[in-house]
Amino acid sequence: MAGVKERAVLVLEDGTVYHGYAFGARGKTVGEVVFNTAQTGYQEIMTDPSYHGQIVVMTYPHQGNYGVNVYDMQSNRPWVRGFVAKEFSRVASNPRAQQTIGEFMEFYGVVGIEGIDTRALVRKIREGGVLKGTIAHASLFGAPDHAFTQEELEALRREAQAWTDIDGRDMTPEVSTPLPYAWPTLKSGRRIVVMDFGIKHAIVENLAALGFEVIVVPGKTPAHQIMALEPHGLLISNGPGDPTMPRYAHETIWKLMGLLPTFGICLGHQLLALAAGGRTFKMKFGHRGANHPVKNLQTGKIEITSQNHGYAVDIDSLKDFRPTHVNLNDGTLEGMAHARYPVFSVQYHPEAAPGPHDALYLFRRFLEEVEAFHGATGLPVEKQRADQHGI
């Protein structure tokens, strides 16, 4: 029927139902329901591999008004399981736009829902923690104006409940590059190997902008293969899922500890802590947004940061690391540095994309660590350390 908005529902695993209207690709999807407080940056959010397995609810009510373009992609496709907003724009008011958000979601098969009470949904997640949920469009049941029955809603609830949890699941093989590759750059300076657990383009772009030669390798790459590339530094990337599950990464990172200047971001921060004998825990609803205040314990300055994580490092479990940054909202650990080695990490995203650039200095700090390390030691010492580590 022309002009009729297609009905849709979001059904949570506890039976809560939110009625709204279909948007994006038509169909059904299941995932972990989380929220993001950023006002803009929906394209970067959808294409961030760290959101793999999740249905993202945007707290800012209006999304899509500036459209979508190829330049803001953070990977080669969207990774969200579903996308939720109070209202999506049908037009793209931006000269950079190449598609509307609706066209983008339809092209890539992203199922969405709009018109629900997103404030009530976010309050529920904040108070009770993240839940699994199912988005379903009415056309699956026969007609765009189909009224969902209690039996249909119960079936959708059971589907959400049965969906495989992110907890206890290694998601690296689903998002990591299958083969090593070199990132295009105009310069050829110190060589950095990036362990890819679901990296965003903006991270690699920041490394290349500093003159690094960047080689991206699969997250499962063992230590001896990384060292065979003769890197001057190591970056451990962001990514989705439970940090305790890629145990092969813990072993690799432990073997490389102290051999190379190392920078961990988000999941990479958690993997570093676990490799060093620390602990992580799942947060109630996580940190996802572009406005999280973090205190730099070394300078006393406050940084407004972009964040996207559902797990955190237990600050009391650190052994060879010292805290360098803490979250001002809940006191959780946001950064750490090794007591002896040029190894440091942050839980947030210094590259932003989307978000503020308060933490871009961390990439230059990494460059300085690399230059200082190789100026003071050189390859023979690295070879000796590698032999000691059995690499």
From Swiss-Prot:
<dbReference type="InterPro" id="IPR002474">
    <property type="entry name" value="CarbamoylP_synth_ssu_N"/>
</dbReference>
<comment type="pathway">
    <text>Pyrimidine metabolism; UMP biosynthesis via de novo pathway; (S)-dihydroorotate from bicarbonate: step 1/3.</text>
</comment>
<keyword id="KW-0055">Arginine biosynthesis</keyword>
<dbReference type="GO" id="GO:0006526">
    <property type="term" value="P:L-arginine biosynthetic process"/>
</dbReference>
<dbReference type="InterPro" id="IPR036480">
    <property type="entry name" value="CarbP_synth_ssu_N_sf"/>
</dbReference>
<feature type="binding site">
    <location>
        <position position="239"/>
    </location>
    <ligand>
        <name>L-glutamine</name>
    </ligand>
</feature>
<keyword id="KW-0067">ATP-binding</keyword>
<dbReference type="GO" id="GO:0006207">
    <property type="term" value="P:'de novo' pyrimidine nucleobase biosynthetic process"/>
</dbReference>
<feature type="binding site">
    <location>
        <position position="270"/>
    </location>
    <ligand>
        <name>L-glutamine</name>
    </ligand>
</feature>
<dbReference type="GO" id="GO:0044205">
    <property type="term" value="P:'de novo' UMP biosynthetic process"/>
</dbReference>
<feature type="binding site">
    <location>
        <position position="310"/>
    </location>
    <ligand>
        <name>L-glutamine</name>
    </ligand>
</feature>
<dbReference type="GO" id="GO:0004359">
    <property type="term" value="F:glutaminase activity"/>
</dbReference>
<comment type="similarity">
    <text>Belongs to the CarA family.</text>
</comment>
<dbReference type="InterPro" id="IPR017926">
    <property type="entry name" value="GATASE"/>
</dbReference>
<feature type="binding site">
    <location>
        <position position="311"/>
    </location>
    <ligand>
        <name>L-glutamine</name>
    </ligand>
</feature>
<dbReference type="InterPro" id="IPR029062">
    <property type="entry name" value="Class_I_gatase-like"/>
</dbReference>
<feature type="domain" description="Glutamine amidotransferase type-1">
    <location>
        <begin position="191"/>
        <end position="376"/>
    </location>
</feature>
<feature type="binding site">
    <location>
        <position position="50"/>
    </location>
    <ligand>
        <name>L-glutamine</name>
    </ligand>
</feature>
<feature type="active site">
    <location>
        <position position="351"/>
    </location>
</feature>
<feature type="binding site">
    <location>
        <position position="308"/>
    </location>
    <ligand>
        <name>L-glutamine</name>
    </ligand>
</feature>
<comment type="subunit">
    <text>Composed of two chains; the small (or glutamine) chain promotes the hydrolysis of glutamine to ammonia, which is used by the large (or ammonia) chain to synthesize carbamoyl phosphate. Tetramer of heterodimers (alpha,beta)4.</text>
</comment>
<dbReference type="GO" id="GO:0004088">
    <property type="term" value="F:carbamoyl-phosphate synthase (glutamine-hydrolyzing) activity"/>
</dbReference>
<feature type="active site">
    <location>
        <position position="349"/>
    </location>
</feature>
<comment type="function">
    <text>Small subunit of the glutamine-dependent carbamoyl phosphate synthetase (CPSase). CPSase catalyzes the formation of carbamoyl phosphate from the ammonia moiety of glutamine, carbonate, and phosphate donated by ATP, constituting the first step of 2 biosynthetic pathways, one leading to arginine and/or urea and the other to pyrimidine nucleotides. The small subunit (glutamine amidotransferase) binds and cleaves glutamine to supply the large subunit with the substrate ammonia.</text>
</comment>
<feature type="active site" description="Nucleophile">
    <location>
        <position position="266"/>
    </location>
</feature>
<keyword id="KW-0028">Amino-acid biosynthesis</keyword>
<dbReference type="GO" id="GO:0006541">
    <property type="term" value="P:glutamine metabolic process"/>
</dbReference>
<dbReference type="InterPro" id="IPR050472">
    <property type="entry name" value="Anth_synth/Amidotransfase"/>
</dbReference>
<dbReference type="InterPro" id="IPR006274">
    <property type="entry name" value="CarbamoylP_synth_ssu"/>
</dbReference>
<dbReference type="Pfam" id="PF00117">
    <property type="entry name" value="GATase"/>
</dbReference>
<comment type="pathway">
    <text>Amino-acid biosynthesis; L-arginine biosynthesis; carbamoyl phosphate from bicarbonate: step 1/1.</text>
</comment>
<feature type="binding site">
    <location>
        <position position="267"/>
    </location>
    <ligand>
        <name>L-glutamine</name>
    </ligand>
</feature>
<feature type="binding site">
    <location>
        <position position="241"/>
    </location>
    <ligand>
        <name>L-glutamine</name>
    </ligand>
</feature>
<keyword id="KW-0436">Ligase</keyword>
<dbReference type="GO" id="GO:0005524">
    <property type="term" value="F:ATP binding"/>
</dbReference>
<protein>
    <recommendedName>
        <fullName>Carbamoyl phosphate synthase small chain</fullName>
        <ecNumber>6.3.5.5</ecNumber>
    </recommendedName>
</protein>
<feature type="region of interest" description="CPSase">
    <location>
        <begin position="1"/>
        <end position="187"/>
    </location>
</feature>
<keyword id="KW-0547">Nucleotide-binding</keyword>
<dbReference type="InterPro" id="IPR035686">
    <property type="entry name" value="CPSase_GATase1"/>
</dbReference>
<keyword id="KW-0665">Pyrimidine biosynthesis</keyword>
<keyword id="KW-0315">Glutamine amidotransferase</keyword>
<dbReference type="Pfam" id="PF00988">
    <property type="entry name" value="CPSase_sm_chain"/>
</dbReference>
